[in-house]
Amino acid sequence: GMTVPNEIEDAKLVYEYVKSLPFAGPVAMTGHSQGGVIASMTAGDLGADNIKCVVLLAPAAVLRDDAIRGNTMGARYNPLDPPEYVQLFGDKKLGREYIKTAFSLPIYETAQKYTGPACIIHGTGDQVVPYTYGERYHNIWPGSELHILHAADHMFSKEMQKVVDITVDFLVKNLK
């Protein structure tokens, strides 16, 4: 089943593959929600020598606190003895291993090891991940850019073009 640690391992394999390509230039990491957590922790593990810059969109560092609380996206469970899986929206299921690994995930501790340029974009109207989780990334990454978008939701549904523009401008500036 999917866990954050095995998604980080997958991200490292993708990085290794990209770096093996003869035409590969500098590598950036970007991710939305849980993908932002994975991008931040992978960048922390690989370091600024390997990852030129990072962009996080509504990074879901809340997932650890959710697991500790026993409430992930509205699905409730005993955090000390999670079931085999919990039912999420639609037909989505979250497995026991995900909850158990999320419970003690060193999200900010690992991400903090990254010292390169970073950009965090988060909305004040995010009902899934409070924007304070994005602010905390800004606090652990001195010199990072923080864009707090007023009333923007978790999917940036009304601000998509603005998010794309901020992301592209940042990547163009930092991947030269």
Model-inferred region functions:
Residues 22-32:
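Alpha/beta-hydrolase fold nucleophile elbow
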Residues 6-9, 38, 162:
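Conserved active-site and cofactor/substrate-binding residues in soluble primary-metabolism enzymes
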